[in-house]
Amino acid sequence: MVCEKCEKKLGRVITPDTWKDGARNTTESGGRKINENKMLTSKKAGFDPYGKSGFSTCRICKSSVHQSGSHYCQGCAYKKGICAMCGKKVLDTKNYKQTSV
């Protein structure tokens, strides 16, 4: 669950919008080279799944969060009715029987 304010912070789709002129995410000038090995040409190390990549732990259950910039996991955010990114109350769960199965 994410509030309206935090929806703007969510990531964008990686695919290029080639059908739109002046799209932000196109690689027309100096994009990725063809047949380029990114592991050899990149300046920093390759993908490190266990390294610090912006993912933190949930403030309630201490499990890993699967969305960068979030403070709560989706299960806890659903149970409490709060935004996963900022913790703002999104849903009144007073009369609900919330379960995360």
UniProtKB/Swiss-Prot annotation:
Record has Cytoplasm as a keyword: yes
Cell compartments where the protein resides: Cytoplasm
Chief place where the protein resides: cytoplasm
GO terms, biological process: cytoplasmic microtubule organization; mRNA processing; RNA splicing
Keyword Coiled coil: no
Gene Ontology CC entries for this record: cytoplasm; dendrite; spliceosomal complex
UniProt keywords, alphabetically: Cytoplasm, mRNA processing, mRNA splicing, Spliceosome
Pfam families associated with the record: Cript
One GO MF term: PDZ domain binding
Similarity comment text for this entry: Belongs to the CRIPT family.
Subunit structure: Component of the minor spliceosome, which splices U12-type introns.
Protein purpose: As a component of the minor spliceosome, involved in the splicing of U12-type introns in pre-mRNAs.
Protein name as annotated: Cysteine-rich PDZ-binding protein
Gene: cript
